[in-house]
């Protein structure tokens, strides 16, 4: 886990510096990297690891409970934002989405491999593809459209995009019906190397994005630690995993990778939603920054304990 923490710090720093020196070109690089991860790396990782996944009751029920836990966490965030902190809808909407949206793709899969071992990567991929992504494309977009100041896309368009513009999900579907012969050990091992590359490339793009936001005046770096930032940290680090564990404990033996994924920091795409739908962009960027800064040292300690 130490190398992941160092890689994240180095990659974010490199991304910030790249944006300072290359300007708009760095933004093009960052978006290209994210597309490469989405359309090439993650589908390969998903296919070769899901093909080896044993789908039992714990995994199947865990997926449903994962959806439920994220929705409940988002509801907690919304209620705290509106009733306790008295936040405007665009800000409270971000807080709800933070409760809903974790960084399980760029960070979660690699962390699962580093802390739990590569035998758990298939479970981490399953959580990302079958729990987090459906919630993002449906739930997060719906909250953004309902609370933002700009008109959004229609629900049918979002659902259609979820199925036809979601390469990792397609890879998961193919892997579930593929024979084991299509996922030989050598390719599974190669996919583990790709997993280790994801944080390096992904957080370079994060660094570029944060630098762009700071340059445009949307946020300061590091962002101020406000009450809503504190709630965001609690939602991602404590509430989400606690709700999932509480729901699962009476019924199943929750896969370790599912619980670990629930603790991941806020996802980068929250900033994208904030821009598109007119949500609170500085808060969105700040929530991503702070939840990541808090999560990394905690996960580092966990890797030593485990």
What is each model feature region?
Residues 1-306:
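Alpha-helical transmembrane segments of multi-pass small-molecule/ion transporters
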